[in-house]
From Swiss-Prot:
HAMAP family: HslU (MF_00249). GO terms for molecular function: ATP binding; ATP hydrolysis activity; peptidase activity; proteasome-activating activity. This is ATP-dependent protease ATPase subunit HslU. It is found in: Cytoplasm. GO terms for biological process: protein unfolding; proteolysis involved in protein catabolic process. Its main location: cytoplasm. It comes from the Bacteria. InterPro entries: AAA+_ATPase, ATP-dep_Clp_protease_ClpX, ATPase_AAA_core, Clp_ATPase_C, HslU, P-loop_NTPase. ATPase subunit of a proteasome-like degradation complex; this subunit has chaperone activity. The binding of ATP and its subsequent hydrolysis by HslU are essential for unfolding of protein substrates subsequently hydrolyzed by HslV. HslU recognizes the N-terminal part of its protein substrates and unfolds these before they are guided to HslV for hydrolysis. The keyword ATP-binding applies. A double ring-shaped homohexamer of HslV is capped on each side by a ring-shaped HslU homohexamer. The assembly of the HslU/HslV complex is dependent on binding of ATP.
Length: 442
């Protein structure tokens, strides 16, 4: 679980996302409150529930990017789901309970990696001994039985060589665990849980089987470390820790929640809209979900919902769900200045990406300040005239601008291209000015 302060979280998000200070502050405080709650006494900890967030803003302003970056910072079970993929229980489609099942699977993977990392030193020692046994087998008598031999000095010499990497390419024969059976089970939509249980059953069938393989020492070391670490980890303890991590630190990011709002003119059962909201309600307010790893309580899972709300409004959500999303954050539409900053300031910005890609062919790209400004203006103008898709427009504009250079790069090794206002106007001018062209091409 992350122990970063809200200021540190915002600073980290600033490295990748331009603007949207309110949204960054809201998610930073929510993430820090997870840590604060864990410092409380048992009784008070049970009473403190997370304050779920609703992020409202046009497409392409950073809602989903905040979720992606938050997942890396959280160091906790995190899952991002599209609200449009679900339908009401009893109809064809995914049920909302699968969100918690998937979140638990994420937690199992996260905890297993952490536990195996703790056991790495012991696993390395055990793997080393098994490789030395394969390199220096005990002699056999006339009846084929192994005899103990005093080869401690030779073993130490080989151990030294093994650690120095001198034996990496030597081939040895080892008994390794057989790979689990890869069985793909097709089930009707909405029956994913049955498929998971059947897959688990087939995987368990070949779990304890061993298989002799000829393998190089370097690859054997990696395989044996994983095998030994997995053997040292207690599966029951792992499940308990994973479920505790989900219940106390789990975060669910619900994207496109505006697409499940009921539209005024529709009538009859709305199974993929209002029906989904009704099914989401128990999860958000707290219930118990049955997963293959055990029962999971959702009372303290943090839900962050986001939507563009261009057609619907937040008030179109059912009142009970509105009440469960108390923190509202509005993200603002991007300006020309924002586009200019997006092109240059974030880590691995778009301009840096294109420079690095072309450098692989020996082509040098230089973006001037006025060229970047003109690019930002071009993206903003097209957004204003056609559909406003936010920062995603920059990808389209940049790809169109770099099309000729990208195509000829392999023949232009050693050359330098300067992207200035004139270059941008020459390659994008007509497209920007002609509304019909920009509507279909940009």
């Amino acid at each position: 679980m992350s122990e970063m302060t809200p200021r540190e979280i915002v600073h980290e998000l600033d490295r990748h996302i331009i603007g949207q200070a309110d949204a960054k502050r809201a998610v930073a405080v929510a993430l820090r409150n997870r840590w604060r709650r864990m410092q409380l006494g048992e009784e008070m900890r049970h009473e403190v529930t997370p304050k779920n967030i609703l992020m409202i803003g046009p497409t392409g302003v950073g809602k989903t990017e905040i979720a992606r970056r938050l997942a890396k910072l959280a160091n906790a079970p995190f899952i991002k789901v599209e609200a449009t993929k679900f339908t009401e229980v009893g109809y064809v489609g995914k049920e909302v309970d699968s969100i918690i099942r998937d979140l638990t699977d994420v937690a199992i993977k996260l905890v297993r990696e952490t536990e195996m990392e703790k056991m790495k030193y012991r696993a390395e020692e055990a793997a080393e001994e098994r490789i030395l046994d394969a390199l220096l087998p005990n002699p056999r008598n006339t009846w084929g039985e192994e005899e103990k031999a005093d080869n401690s000095n030779t073993r130490q010499i080989f151990r030294k060589k093994l650690r120095e990497g001198q034996l990496d390419d030597k081939e040895i024969e080892l008994e390794l665990s057989a790979s689990p059976m890869g069985v793909e089970i097709m089930t009707p939509p909405g029956m994913e849980e049955m498929a998971n249980q059947l897959q688990g059953l087939f995987q368990n069938l070949g779990q304890n089987q061993k298989k002799k393989r000829k393998i190089k020492v370097k690859e054997a070391m990696k395989a044996l470390i994983e095998e030994e670490a997995a053997r040292l980890v207690n599966p029951e303890e792992l499940k308990q820790k994973a479920i505790a991590a989900v219940e106390n630190n789990g975060i669910v990011f619900l994207d496109e929640i505006d697409k499940i709002c009921k539209r005024g003119e529709s009538s009859g059962p709305d199974v993929s809209r209002e029906g989904v909201q009704r099914d989401l309600l128990p999860l958000v307010e707290g219930c118990t979900v049955n997963t293959k790893h055990g029962m999971v309580k959702t009372d303290h899972i943090l839900f962050v919902a986001s939507g563009a709300f261009q057609v619907a409004r937040p008030s179109d959500l059912i009142p009970e769900l509105q009440g469960r999303l108390p923190i509202r954050v509005e993200l603002t539409a991007l300006t020309t200045d924002d586009f200019e900053r997006i092109l240059t300031e974030p880590n691995a910005s778009l301009t840096d990406q294109y420079k690095a890609l072309m450098a692989t062919e020996g082509v040098n790209i230089e973006f001037t300040k006025d060229g970047i400004r003109r690019l930002a203006e071009a993206a903003w103008q097209v957004n204003e005239r056609t559909e406003n898709i936010g920062a995603r427009r920059l990808h389209t504009v940049m790809e169109r601008l770099m099309e000729d250079i990208s195509f000829d790069a392999s023949e232009k090794s050693g050359e330098t291209f300067v992207i200035d206002t004139d270059y941008v106007n020459a390659h994008l001018g007509k497209l920007i000015e002609d509304e019909d062209l920009s509507r279909f091409i940009l």
